Amino acid sequence: MKYIGAHVSAAGGVENAVLRAVEIGGNAFALFTKNQRQWQAATLKAETIEKFKRFCQVHQFTADQILPHDSYLINLGHPELENRQKSVAAFIDEMQRVNQLGLKLLNFHPGSHLNKISERDCLAYIAESINIAIKTVPNVVAVIENTAGQGSNMGYRFEHLAEIIEQVEDKSRVGVCLDTCHLFSAGYDISSWQACEKTFTDFDQIVGYAFLRGMHLNGSKTALGSRVDRHHCLRDGTIGTAVFEYIMQHHQFDHIPLILETIQPEIWAEEIQFLRDLSAK
């Protein structure tokens, strides 16, 4: 079964994200468990946690169908120790929130070297940061998102993801989320069925489908290999729709959250139906 949804707003309380996912016909969703542009957040109240869990139960969402995302401020590969420690502390807090909500995945952007250290050192810091977090918080899987490679962001090559995973001590606590826009912008061609075969075979050989815990389904406004991260609607932009048909028709993408982060929330319900129609072709 395909779990399809979108990154919905948690404004007014995380429990509202469940209702917004239902409104657009999703059987999956992503959310921020706190303001993604602030370091600090109030702790989750017992009442909020209870409501979130109850709403999930009522609307039949399991932890496998929900992909929380961490704060954009966090940089687990920061070259400076003090800033890296601040990021690790914030990441641990995010993991604890996810665990409190009864969820088990935390999606994050790996980190940036800020042109101050080598890529290899940055990847080692990211892995070290993950190791600290998963030793501190039980149950939650750290889900590394591939990036477009904009600026000094790491994670734009499959080899980066594999190198991080290799250095994580408990492999059951680490996974990957592939973003289609980021793949294309980073230079992985997914614009045809044949191109998808090559790219996803490479992914399986270098990283492995066993680590795939979610996907972000996005169109792109920029060209193949642009290294610029600009999302578009599914049926617009430079990628085309072959990749979405490929994903919907291959079992390797079953039972993981397939999350829209496309730029027009008002057509998410339509885009979800479009994906479901592709799986029936």
UniProtKB/Swiss-Prot annotation:
It catalyses: Endonucleolytic cleavage to 5'-phosphooligonucleotide end-products. Its EC number is 3.1.21.2. The keyword Magnesium does not apply. Zn(2+) 1 binds at H69, H109, E145. Binds 3 Zn(2+) ions. It is an enzyme of class 3 (hydrolase). Gene3D superfamilies: Divalent-metal-dependent TIM barrel enzymes. Keywords: DNA damage, DNA repair, Endonuclease, Hydrolase, Metal-binding, Nuclease, Zinc. Zn(2+) 2 binds at E145, D179, H216, E261. GO terms for molecular function: deoxyribonuclease IV (phage-T4-induced) activity; DNA binding; DNA-(apurinic or apyrimidinic site) endonuclease activity; phosphoric diester hydrolase activity; zinc ion binding. SMART domains: AP2Ec. GO terms for biological process: base-excision repair. The keyword DNA repair applies. Zn(2+) 3 binds at H182, D229, H231. Its cofactor is Zn(2+). Pfam families: AP_endonuc_2 (PF01261). PANTHER family: APURINIC-APYRIMIDINIC ENDONUCLEASE (PTHR21445:SF0), ENDONUCLEASE IV ENDODEOXYRIBONUCLEASE IV (PTHR21445). Endonuclease IV plays a role in DNA repair. It cleaves phosphodiester bonds at apurinic or apyrimidinic (AP) sites, generating a 3'-hydroxyl group and a 5'-terminal sugar phosphate. HAMAP family: Nfo. Belongs to the AP endonuclease 2 family. This is Probable endonuclease 4.
